[in-house]
Amino acid sequence: DFIYDLVEDTYSPDNGRPSLDPVMLVKIPLIQCFYGIRSMRQTIKDIEVNTAYRWFLGLTLDDKAPHFTTYGKNYSRRFQEKGLIESIFTHILGLCINAGLIDPTEIFIDGTHIKAAANNRKFINQEVEKQAKFMSEQLEIEINQDRVKHGKKPLKPVEKREVKNQKLSTTDPESGWFHKGDHKEVFAYSAQVACDKYGWALAYSVEAGNIHDSQAFPALFAKLEPLKPEYIIADSGYKTPSIAKFLIDKEITPVLPYTRPRGKKGQLRPKDFVYDEHFDCVLCPEHQALTYRTTTREGYREYKSDPAICANCPLLSVCTTSKNHQKVVTRHIWKEYLEQCEDIRHQRG
């Protein structure tokens, strides 16, 4: 009955022809989703001949199934702008929480891509501003604090944001161009879903397919924060310095997976260079200290070696390919939060 309350203001009690039952209009897409029916037109055709579907919708054998265009018009005119599906989801979630079926202390999140119903050949190229990264304002403040601490001048604010060229679907402009593997490219959506350890879905968000999981995280977490989670378990797509810092600062434990160190085969790996917090330097395998030089706008401190020492180093060929024999190691100013995540990964089984 709560659905009638949610849609009450979209119906007139004393004008017009008798309307379709709003509960039935909500149930129809559920049939389409549960049974993987490709289109609303085919869903309505199946409802006409399937007695189980009719019973679920409250239709007798003599009742006429609604026309597929009738469903589309009702949805777009009455429900689309109201966020009806979101309201129904929230209401049912509240019932589950009150019944004690959900344990929000440990929340698992993951993202997947859903192919859009859009022709890959129908698009325009346009220039758009690059999306600001999560916690970019806080990062900018701490970058300048770090530079001042090291005797460097603060960076000037960026006057003009970077732009990039991207494909915009003329069929479905809200979708995004997604690179699926090495060769497949499609217009798609990125769906982020959170669930508890029993598998109950707690929240979701949908973004354009070209939005990275880490950029979609803030919208999803905003829905999870009222549940007061103690642990957030996620895959490597969410393993970034900003997300690690954000969760730890909120006293939420991030449980993130092992990620293979990047680097060229046969070359020294980042783990071979040890950061010395006390002296703020990086020690190489041959015990040379790489000293601090600058902090970049992206939030990375640069530590550089002495080329004169490196020129005679026995590990030079597997250490760096730079022409001046200088090794450069970068370390994010929030790297310590990722290191805490590594400690957590080894603690919890």
Locations of the language-model features?
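Anion-binding and metal-coordination hotspots
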Residues: 36-49, 59-349
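Basic, short loop/linker segments at the boundary and entry of helix-turn-helix/winged-helix-like folds
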Residues: 1-30, 35-36, 332-338
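Short amphipathic alpha-helical interface patches used for protein-protein assembly/oligomerization
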Residues: 53-57
